[in-house]
Amino acid sequence: MEEVRRHLRIGVPLPCYFIGGSDDQRTRTILNKIVSITTEGGTGFDTHRFSGNVSADTVGDAAFEITFGGGRRCVVCEDLPFGSMGENEFKKFEQLVTEVSEMGGSTVLVFAFYSVETEPKKDSKAKSESKTGKKNRVEALKKLVDKCSGGVINCETPTTAELCTIIEKTCAK
């Protein structure tokens, strides 16, 4: 996590990110920071946002197209339903993450989850399988992003101590 923060601070994005957790505001703030440092402001033709049910081919087309400004492009996938996705489609997403991480920084691929539980329950007996018997694909995606030199960011609700620190820093300004 510290390496991800360092990259965001100096303005050099990693090739892939997985952002999720219970705090939507933190998730959106980090997502907007990544998009703005990737495409110099976060607006324009080099930013692609997908939400909900979208195919890996569509995301791949956006990731590998030629940029207008000659810089980096950012492809954001929000709340993709990996649990209901077919096995072949999920394998395409896995291949896409691997290919983007090998591209050398011309594309930044971000998976953001607001309404999907990204952390497995601590009391669950089967950590890798869901209630339907399928593997937990969100967890598999997190591991793949981490393995491919990407950033995994869990945005949990701040504790009381963290809130006090934020208030102290704000008041000190």
Report residues per predicted region.
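Conserved beta/loop motifs at nucleotide-recognition and modification sites
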Residues: 1-173
